[in-house]
Amino acid sequence: MKTRRAFALGAIAVLGLALAISATDSLAQQKQRVSFSIPAENSKYVQQHVIEVGDTPGHEVRVYELRRSFPGNAPAINAVKVKEMIGSGMSDYVDGTGPNSNYTVFVLENGEKFFSRGTTLAQNTGSGKLSTVSVARITGGTGKLLGIQGTVRTTGTANPKANFSEAQYEIEYWIEK
């Protein structure tokens, strides 16, 4: 009788410990969502190099660096505010319409970073501005963000020739151990 009781108590303790560990793991991997907008005054094309392809009028290949800052109301990732976003990319547009491959470094206030790789589709709206839709995969991070994974979705408006870019972001992420 005593051995059954000891076994049952031991089994309950092991089961409780297993549940606590799995609950901790699921909390660590719980998906988080962050949504925010970046107005044009907080975005700047730092460098752009445009090459006319020459096969079709208006066909341009462009390499660029786009920096976005958060002077106020910064979003937080893992409870730390984002300080800056540094995007590098290459577009292949005909009259402002076409694909764009890009990489972004998200720099947090504590110096940690996470990275994404994405694809953007731009469409010329006819007013010199481009309507953009992007999807990016989070590829990793540093420090406490080492196991970060997730998706970055963006919609926006841009006019690279006028150094204008504004966007709305939705980041869904989790941190794996």
Located regions from the model:
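Bacterial N-terminal signal peptides
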Residues: 10-22
